A protein has these predicted regions:
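Bacterial N-terminal signal peptides that target proteins for export
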Residues: 3-15
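Bacterial N-terminal signal peptides
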Residues: 14-24
Length: 303
């Protein structure tokens, strides 16, 4: 073999070795996708300054806490925070995010924001209420001629996106959804110190007919959801039961959603894959926290 042939062979081996090293990383990154929404500064929306709106919370802190942890686990990140997290932007982002999902992907969706009971108009809820996420530009109350709830994202609408994603990633993939909101909370209470309580959500339902909200008492900690042979399995973590309030907690001088805090704490050592055992650990940690004695997380899964 001549010198040139030896050089070509050496080059081929080097290129092959390099590809063997970097290709798994490309596949790993492409196979793990995360989309996060975190809203803190609801009061900064000047377009809603003339109405009684939502109190500020600390949803952006949750996103800032989780993103580095997810990146370390190989996830590509898409996020919307504060004024970026309008209803239109969330919808467009969920659509574009779902279009990127591929067979076998592990998908993580996270929502840290207010939540609100929303009057059910299609009759699919036995108690007459849907649950809705509250984007940055959603009003708290119905206003004739101005706002009819179009910026709320109901659980029915969210489920449409989830079904699309589950179909795209297929049975070889998996979908996680973390909802650190609340649909039965009251309002902000106290000053920001160790003894204060920041509550997400409201106990006032959104209703065009002025219907009074009465929460359904469901004490199940684990709920079975739809399963299909052509869909990815799904696991949904919710911060509390439908009749409870979702309290933020303070750690190292910062406020976080309690569910987000313990999801991050758990994922610092647990692998985020198709094994959902880590979600049970999150539930255990929250139940052990004396600050959350009146709050019980809920796990919904197709497994």
């Amino acid at each position: 073999m001549g010198i040139i042939d030896k050089q070509k062979t050496t080059l081929r081996i080097a290129v092959l070795g390099l590809l063997m090293v970097i290709l798994p990383f490309f596949g790993y990154s492409q196979g793990k996708r995360a989309f996060l929404v975190g809203i803190s500064n609801y009061s900064s929306n000047q377009q809603l300054a003339d109405v009684k709106g939502w109190n500020d919370i600390h949803g952006e802190n949750d996103v800032n806490l989780l993103v580095p942890t997810l990146i370390k686990q190989g996830f590509s990140i898409q996020k919307l925070c504060n004024r970026e997290a309008t209803a239109n932007n969330i919808r467009k982002s969920l659509t574009s995010f779902s279009e990127k999902c591929k067979s076998g992907d592990i998908v993580y969706l996270h929502f840290s924001c207010h939540g609100q009971p929303f009057e059910d108009y299609d009759g699919d809820e036995s108690d007459g209420w849907d649950e809705a996420l509250v984007p940055f530009d959603a009003l708290k109350e119905y206003q004739q001629g101005r706002y009819s709830g179009e910026n709320h994202i109901t659980d029915d609408e969210l489920n449409t996106y989830l079904k699309t994603i589950r179909n795209r990633v297929g049975p070889k993939g998996f979908v996680y959804v973390v909802i650190d909101a609340c649909h039965a909370g009251s309002s902000y209470r106290g000053d920001e110190n160790e003894d204060s309580v920041v509550i997400r959500g409201t106990d006032k339902g959104f209703s065009k007919s002025n219907k009074q909200y009465a929460p359904r008492i469901d004490k199940r900690g684990k709920i079975k959801v739809e399963k299909s042979a052509n869909m990815a399995n799904i696991c949904i973590l919710e911060a509390c039961r439908s009749y409870q309030v979702n309290s933020e907690i303070c750690a190292d001088g910062k406020y976080y959603g309690s569910l987000s805090f313990y999801v991050n704490k758990t994922l610092l050592s647990a692998k985020l894959d198709k094994n959902i055992s880590w979600t049970e650990r999150v539930s255990q940690l929250m139940n052990q926290d004396t600050r959350l004695v009146r709050q019980n997380p809920v796990i919904e899964t197709s497994l």
